[in-house]
Amino acid sequence: MAKDDSSVRCFQGLLIFGNVIVGMCGIALTAECIFFVSDQHSLYPLLEATDNDDIYGAAWIGMFVGICLFCLSVLGIVGIMKSNRKILLAYFILMFIVYGFEVASCITAATQRDFFTPNLFLKQMLERYQNNSPPNNDDQWKNNGVTKTWDRLMLQDHCCGVNGPSDWQRYTSAFRTANNDADYPWPRQCCVMNSLKEPLNVEACKLGVPGYYHKEGCYELISGPMNRHAWGVAWFGFAILCWTFWVLLGTMFYWSRIEY
């Protein structure tokens, strides 16, 4: 392949452009995954307590992949500009490894969406909220995290339980075991608060008088951010994989035509 051929120069330009896009996508993927693992909504304790926080694992892999894609895109551009077979061979080998990691990250993130069900968070809430009799320190840590997260959610987002206040009445729970039903039909955080973060009317809240307790459940406030992040990591990753596939294919064709 003659390096001074105008068609070759044009093809090189296309491949360089393709790698520039790959590098930019890598930076964007890293930024997205950093935003996700920074846990802006402070929901990680709920996932940690389920012993299945694979979505965070997928995001960490995405961060690694994003950085690698940026670095490898630079390597690919150098190899294309110099028409160096050895540099491009190293580029292919490393890119295929990174490609495999990103496939794993995307599949993990996409499949985790079905994991975020109401029953998952309901079971966890009933077992761990205000549970002060854990079998070991690890469970105590998880129970404390779940309790603090639920307290914050119910206070901050004006909701109660997973599906609503009836969760605390309908099912057996650690909270029900520790508290009298008449005094605590549901946690105080379910009550409408005044400016001092105190129940507006405790008795009315306990009796379930409309306007003095929160009727809405918290499930949408939990699953919404998690699902959005899961789909973001998965589908943006898949889009990057599709683009990278064609860039790799074109670069492999170019590599096969480089003269020894």
Curated annotation (Swiss-Prot):
InterPro entries: Tetraspanin/Peripherin, Tetraspanin_EC2_sf
Keywords of this entry: Membrane, Transmembrane, Transmembrane helix
SUPFAM superfamilies: Tetraspanin
Membrane topology (Cytoplasmic): 1-12, 82-86, 251-260
Induction, per UniProt: Down-regulated by TGF-beta and serum in quiescent cells. Rapidly and transiently induced by TGF-beta in actively growing cells.
GO BP terms: epithelial cell differentiation; response to bacterium
Membrane topology: Multi-pass membrane protein
One GO cellular component, as annotated: apical plasma membrane urothelial plaque
Compartmental location: Membrane
Transmembrane spans: 13-38, 61-81, 87-107, 230-250
Top-level division of the source organism's lineage: Eukaryota
Extracellular side: 39-60, 108-229
Subunit structure, as described in the record: Heterodimer with uroplakin-3A (UPK3A) or uroplakin-3B (UPK3B).
Entry similarity comment: Belongs to the tetraspanin (TM4SF) family.
Task performed by this protein: Component of the asymmetric unit membrane (AUM); a highly specialized biomembrane elaborated by terminally differentiated urothelial cells.
PANTHER family in the record: TESTIS-SPECIFIC EXPRESSED PROTEIN 55, UROPLAKIN-1B
Protein name in the entry: Uroplakin-1b
Source organism per UniProt: Neovison vison (American mink)
